[in-house]
Each structure stands twice: as C-alpha cells, then as structure tokens.
C-alpha cells in the first residue's frame, strides 16, 4: 500500500467499525442494551470486581459515559456495586445472575453479527484479520485486552 493509496487502511477500518457498531447497536435493542452497556457487562464478566473507570480506559470512552452506562445497568439489576476493600473512592462491579443471562444472549447476538459481517472472508482470512487486529490493539491500547482469563475458562 502506497502513501497515496485511497482508501487508506484507517478509513477502511473506520468504515468496518461503523458497519459492525451500527448492526450490533440495532440488534442489541432486543436486550434493551446500548453498545456501552453491552461492553460494560462483558468487561465485568471478564474481570469481576473491575471499576467503571477501568472499563472506560479499556473501552476508550470517557469515564462519565461509562459511568452512565453502568448506572443504568445497576438500576436494571444487571450489575451490582460493592465498595473496594482498599479505596473508598472506587466501587467494584459484579454481574447479577440476570446480568449474566442478558450478557450471554448479547454475546450470541454479537457473534452472529461478526459472522454476518465477515462472511465474505475465508476462515484463513478471518484468522489473519483477527491476529492483525489483536496485535494492533495490544500495542495501541493494551488495557483493552487486560482481562482475567480465569473467568473465561469458567464460562
């Protein structure tokens, strides 16, 4: 790819991100979730006890936006807050049973959207894109990948 190439890689990545986000946002309405709420639920399941501020860092959105999403999930009974044992200013987040069930359905929705949007690609191409995106995120926002993998093995 030359410097003069259009569309640029960044433009293509942004377009694909917009396509997935739009489709996922529409599909998540079935669970009455926004993208931020879906992300918060997933992050809490991946790392039980995580704070809203940490989820915001991982997600690349403002603490205020994530705080609003988390508050709505708490009000719906999908998440619960507990005081942090060593920090009076921080609250730890945990999923309720209902939150886990909603997250499982939302994950199925997200996987379906991913299958649909990547259907033109071969399995090898899908693996390549996943590997390359993982490397980029690992380099540019390692917090996004800072999850407790023990919680993944329990699911």
What are these regions (language model features)?
Residues 1-31, 155:
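N-terminal leader segment of winged-helix/HTH proteins
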Residues 1-2, 123-155:
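C-terminal regulatory/oligomerization modules of transcriptional regulators
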Residues 8, 12, 19, 23, ...:
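Pre-recognition alpha-helix immediately N-terminal to the DNA-recognition helix
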Residues 17, 42-46, 107, 134:
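Short, locally clustered residues in the helix-turn-helix/winged-helix DNA-binding domain
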Residues 21, 71-138:
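Charged, amphipathic alpha-helical coiled-coil/dimerization segments
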Residues 43, 58, 76:
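Residues within the alpha-helical elements of helix-turn-helix
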Residues 47-51:
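Short capping segments at the starts of secondary-structure elements
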Residues 52-53, 64, 71, 91:
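Residues within helix-turn-helix
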């Amino acid at each position: 790819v030359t410097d003069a190439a259009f569309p640029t890689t960044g433009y293509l990545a942004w377009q694909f991100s917009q396509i997935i986000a739009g489709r996922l946002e529409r599909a998540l309405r079935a669970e009455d979730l926004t993208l931020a709420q879906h992300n918060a639920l997933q992050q809490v399941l991946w790392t039980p006890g995580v704070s809203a501020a940490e989820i915001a860092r991982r997600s690349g959105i403002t603490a205020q936006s994530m705080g609003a999403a988390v508050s709505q999930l708490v009000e719906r009974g999908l998440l619960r807050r507990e005081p942090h044992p060593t920090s009076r200013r921080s609250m730890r987040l945990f999923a309720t049973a209902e939150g886990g069930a909603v997250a499982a359905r939302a994950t199925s929705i997200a996987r379906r959207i991913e299958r649909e949007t990547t259907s033109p690609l071969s399995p090898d191409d899908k693996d390549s894109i996943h590997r390359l995106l993982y490397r980029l995120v690992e380099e540019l926002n390692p917090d996004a990948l800072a999850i407790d993998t023990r919680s993944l093995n329990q699911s």
